[in-house]
Amino acid sequence: MLFSSLVFLWCFLPAVFFLYFITKNLHIRNSVLLTASLFFYAWGEPKYVILMLVSIGLNYFFGLWIGRMQSKHRMRLAVTTCVFLNLLLLGYFKYFNFAVEIANSLLSRFAGGAHTLSFREIALPVGISFYTFQALSYVVDVYRGTIQAQKNIFHLALYISFFPQLIAGPIVKYHDVCEQIENRQCTAEGMAYGIKRFSYGLAKKMLFANTFAATVDWMMEKPLAQLGTVNAWMLAVLYTLQIYFDFSGYSDMAIGLGKMFGFDFMENFNYPYISTSIREFWRRWHISLSTWFREYLYIPLGGNRKGQVRTYVNLLIVFFATGLWHGAGATFIIWGLYHGLFLVVERMGLGKLLEKNCFRGLNHIYTALVVVVGWVFFRADTLADAKVILHQMFTWENGIYPASLFVNPKVIFLAVLGVLLSGIAQSICPKLREHLYEKEVTKTVDIVIMAVLLFLCTMYLVSSTYNPFIYFRF
């Protein structure tokens, strides 16, 4: 079930609100949310609810087991086993197809194609990357002594399966919400802020991201070698806007929904496209994922405490894992290593040059160029496609398609507005930024804007069937 669907907006969510707010008993409210979350997940993939329940049970029992141990050696063995089993589940469903494709490619190259592996493709359960990482953070935190093992399996189940952030994040760490599960308050101010945040996120998705997505997908269906330089750049820029409004829009909706039920989730985006370095970009983009990798991979590897060379290696390992987490494909791995390489280069000295540069505009141009080129790898179906698009971008080609074939005044207007709303307008006018994230809705204009946005999005849903979420693939 999608947040941006009529069923969710006008059936599921009102029903959950009604059942949730007819009682003030927190245990009953948690039961309502857990039941709703399982139903939400089962709506699209009923059989994979069992997989999620297995994950919940696995991590619950390992958490209890680790929490009762006295021997550090046994605790380490138990947490290693649990992490392995979690990654085994994730690896089987997400990376098995990719592994077989690699094996067949190697067999074809070195064995002449005489022997290849036949297999039935395994479907990817929606949200498995997100809830697996949440479960891992719980078990590791119990092992580290950061938190106590949760004895109530229903509380842990709600943490892992909570529908606002189940499908596409933010990745919530257990120690950030464990107290909220057991004790939280729902206020009128929180509800108002949550509705406003959800409405803005829905508008980002429906009015901006979907418009850009339709154009980008149409362009990707054409022979890429015949796009021409102008269209290739237009494709890259529109996808850059699409993925930001798609993913940040979903995060806004998730944060807003959580607030409506009394939960405070961490911010996942902080205007990443106004960054002046790639290092800053990753402090602003998908914050919950980057902090997860920092806390559970980069620091355990040694972080930056074991010399420069080791730091560079650790960064490349983390961004290899970041790329692989996003998708089982060479394009995602290259995208991750590409960003990791620029982070290494910035640590080697480029970062200091950027800090000393008096012309900050050049820093913005550098960062924007690196990010836009990186998104080409992320969007391309194959490395060959990415190579063709990049060739079109950096060597002048006329192409056979006029730009007017792909864009119209609506797309151009939304693209310009999208660029402004990606951080430029908020930087120029800080009050706009404060307004978007203030915790109270006290003005009539806020209510009017929310009503208009919900109406426009509903009309869009009624008239259109195009409604993909990029991060649902992960």
Give, region by region, the residue ranges found by the protein language model.
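Membrane-embedded transmembrane alpha-helical bundles that form the catalytic cores
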Residues: 1-426, 430, 434-473
